[in-house]
Amino acid sequence: MKFPGKRKSKHYFPVSARDPLLHQALPDSEVASSWIVGIDQTLVDIEAKVDDAFIARYGLSSGHSLVIEDDVAEALYKELEREGLITHQFAGGTIGNTMHNYSVLADDRSVLLGVMCSNVQIGGYAYRYLCNTSSRTDLNYLQGVDGAIGRCFTLIGEHGERTFAISPGMMNQLKPESIPEAVIAGASALVLTSYLVRCKAGEPMPEATMQAIAWAKKYNVPVVLTLGTKYVIGDNPQFWREFLQEHVSIVAMNEDEAEALTGLNDPLQASNMALDWVDLVLCTAGPNGLYMAGFTEEEGKRKTQHPLLPGAIPEFNQYEFSRAMRHQECQQPLRIFSHIAPYMGGPEKIMNTNGAGDGALAALLHDITANNYHRLNVPNSSKHGREYLTYSSLAQVCKYANRVSYQVLNQHSPRLTRGLPEREDSLEESYWER
């Protein structure tokens, strides 16, 4: 996808070299930069093949997910290492994945806040975390801890049955004073997950999260929340509705989380209801593709050239060619919606469903940051006659998010290894011209 942003070549989209505006653009060193910030429970996914006796020995229940104590996790990890049973160690965590994927797509800076072992052993899980994270993700603000970061063990039994053991370690020990005000002040977005505010009593992570939200509000930085799982939301949907209304500008969720939040099992209706609380909604709906919902200025609305779609809201995609705005920036807010079916019908064989939503969110964040970058560097462009949130229309953001999800579904890891090609060999030009 072509976006404004620093590139190896000197072309900026959509301005050509003959454009007089471009001559005012500053040399690279003086160009105003844009970045995003995310807070995560630093987590490593460790995959290992084990026998049934191993699972019984550690008191785990085959096929289920259990939280284990730190000493058990340490013993379990040591045995896996000693016996050479580990098949994969990946950096994980919803926000870590999103920051990494954003940096790969945008070839630009993201900042990750969280904890990291002060003492990193070469070849160990913390080392793997650092190795698996894009070099464009800034890890300089991580807070050191004397102990383990989070570990999620996926133990694959003799018959392929997966058993999960989760050890939080010290992943929730992020302190409010480790949240840098200046980094959040200059960011295009602050990205959070619902897990951050649900911790054991006495853990500082929720307080650190609220501190970050306070800085974001002070500097008018949009707060993005990804909903975690339907169980987290289903526990207390009212709490989350109020949380969204009070603190959040953009929500990302799947159809199950959307139902837990709103009580509606139609992703379109759920997205519409979520607009009562937030400015922009990204809702992935598995094999049904993805939905987006947002606001635009009544005067600036643009009609779609795509076929009008039926649904709970008839012809809901009528103005999907409009660009999204924050509700507070609209004089006469108009609700706009878009939907896209899975890219190329979805992959033939899904390698991994974990992370497709994080991939879609990274694409949306890339578009929002591109808009910010363009506003800072070409402020008198006609693109910025109004305070838009996205650079592209809702329909175009859907297309991009969809393409990135496909890429993640098609690989073993939830983290992209490379950016997307600007033009796809597999598609006729008409797909991109649409």
Feature-to-residue mapping (PLM):
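Alpha-helix C-terminal capping segments
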Residues: 99-109, 156-157, 367-369
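Glycine/serine-rich anion-binding loops at beta->alpha junctions
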Residues: 88-101, 350-360
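Active-site gating loops and adjacent loop-to-helix segments of metal-dependent hydrolytic enzymes
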Residues: 56-82
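Ribokinase/PfkB-type carbohydrate-kinase core domain
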Residues: 1-65, 86-90, 94, 115-347, ...
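A structural signal for short, hydrophobic beta-strand segments that form beta-sheets
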Residues: 68, 349-350
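Glycine-/proline-rich flexible loop or hinge segments
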Residues: 75-86, 106-113
